């Protein structure tokens, strides 16, 4: 086609893509290190780090090594972590979850002392703390709701007493946000926030995480309390209930497969929305990259940016450290 034969096009979107400078000027969404939360697994012992086999590049830390990791994270600009604990013992009543000298309580105190500016969020659920691997107490094969909520209240208060800035109930029991808010307020911890796993689906993407915490369910699945992946209206109901009960931040989990839920949540509710880039999503990228099928760094950054574009204000990701280095 000659110069004289050019199409009579008024609007040429490619003009704004011609150079990197132009593309950056008109970019609609930007990922920053401030968006990232690093999930951190702590285990008993001293001076030990274990790689999670199904999550290459992700590790379990003893508390002393977790402290060192947190110092490095903070130096990279990451301002928040979410703590998950592997207890020394599991009990049917889940009492280790609220032990003042439990794994999470010790970790909170040690990290807060060493890196006081770091925002410490803590997982509140019973799956690592009972032999059943379910998020609640179990009786005759049934996951108990109200009895579980009583334990979660104690667990949340114990985390607050240890110095947690936010508690993050991930259990999906009915009514637990209001009950935890009440327990925190009554124990003089009204400043401790709640990040609710409000729309948490019964997903197949959680497998490597359960390996990391040794918390796979020992019978059945979690579909009686986690959400059906087919549902979206139900997610809006769950989010609304948690906000009414006192959640400061709401989360959608998993991430990439549920960006529509993030979008609906952000459009409908005027609260910060978090998303969890879960272990299965992370492991798939790692596996494909190990085979040379994808560029891991580019896929990592694209995945995180897509979560931001969908409306997420906060991104929980095992890639937080790598992404922070890239964003510096």
Swiss-Prot record:
> What class does this enzyme belong to in the EC scheme?
lyase
Q: Does the keyword Metal-binding apply?
A: yes
Q: Which GO terms describe its cellular component?
A: cytosol
Q: Where does Mg(2+) bind?
A: 238
Pathway(s): Porphyrin-containing compound metabolism; protoporphyrin-IX biosynthesis; coproporphyrinogen-III from 5-aminolevulinate: step 1/4
Instruction: Report the Pfam families cross-referenced here.
Output: ALAD
Annotated active site residues, numbered on this chain, are 200, 253
Q: How is its activity regulated?
A: Stimulated by magnesium, inhibited by zinc.
Keyword Lyase assigned to the entry: answer is: yes
Known EC number = 4.2.1.24
Question: Which GO molecular function terms does the record list?
Answer: porphobilinogen synthase activity; zinc ion binding
Q: Which SMART domains match?
A: ALAD
Q: Which reaction does it catalyse?
A: 2 5-aminolevulinate = porphobilinogen + 2 H2O + H(+)
- PROSITE patterns annotated for this entry? D_ALA_DEHYDRATASE
Q: Which UniProt keywords apply?
A: Heme biosynthesis, Lyase, Magnesium, Metal-binding, Porphyrin biosynthesis
The alphabetized list of GO BP terms reads: protoporphyrinogen IX biosynthetic process
Q: Where is 5-aminolevulinate 1 bound in this sequence?
A: 210, 222
Which residues are involved in binding 5-aminolevulinate 2?
A: 279, 318
What family does this belong to? Belongs to the ALAD family.
Protein task: Catalyzes an early step in the biosynthesis of tetrapyrroles. Binds two molecules of 5-aminolevulinate per subunit, each at a distinct site, and catalyzes their condensation to form porphobilinogen.
Summarize subunit and interaction data from the UniProt record for this chain: Homooctamer.
Additional detail: Does not seem to have a metal requirement for activity.
Name of the protein described by the UniProt record: Delta-aminolevulinic acid dehydratase
